[in-house]
Amino acid sequence: MTTPRTVEAGSGPVQEARSIFSPATGFIRRAGFAWTCNPYLGCTFGCRYCYAMYLPQNRRPISEWGRWFAAKRNAVELAQHTAAKLRGAAVYLSSVTDPYLPIERRLHLTRGILEALLPFQPRLLVQTRGPLVVRDLDLFQQWDAIRVNVSIPTDDDAIRQTFEPKAPPLEKRWDALAALRQAGIPVGICVTPLLPLARPQAFVERLLNFAPEVLVVQEFHESGGRFGADTAPAARELAARHEGHAAAYAAVCQELRRRGAVFFEGEAGFFPPAVDEKRSRVKTICPPR
């Protein structure tokens, strides 16, 4: 892997990247994506269960995860030069960072990449927990095949603050989902991993009432040794302190099935959007695992 040259900017680190679109690997490739796109390295949301802190792209100590980011300052220029090769391809935005970190409000790297991609209409999946995503509704509405996944791992903001200390509040994410839905953009809700819940039955009811195009749930997991795929040990230890958490996951899945909900468990739910899914509003259906 080629390491981009790091330079210092007045307000923090930026990097000169050699490419902005990388061939998909791992579960993202298995899901059917050809490319990933990461405008930033690192992440300031600081999720304690994040697999990305263990990946080779993170060259900082694990203890510093959530305290830093690096912006690829030439990301938009690179996207403009290479977007044509992604015509119609499946693109995952983003795999090792969040495309809507707070700094994106000022830097506009993600928006610039979207503007470069738009004429070539790749099948785009946006993965975020950042409410800033609604800023780009005008671009999403011009896409033929798009889905925006928003992470909603719990119903309890105190739990969110424990596991995702710097991530946006849950209600702001629900507000973003509502705005996306109002704009006609297909959405996915990712309960991945499922964190401890305050009111499990009410949480299931809210998921069902919203009825996202795709619903994904996943428990804390271990991969059996594949580098970087495990849920962070610190997060598993936190979850273990909440009595009955494993049983709660099974109960949530059982209730979803009892209510006839179509949902996916784990990586099975991360698949490219279908062409014209936005306009047809046809749900992609797969039997529960």
Region annotations inferred by a language model:
Residues 2-147, 156-158, 170, 182:
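Conserved Radical SAM active-site core
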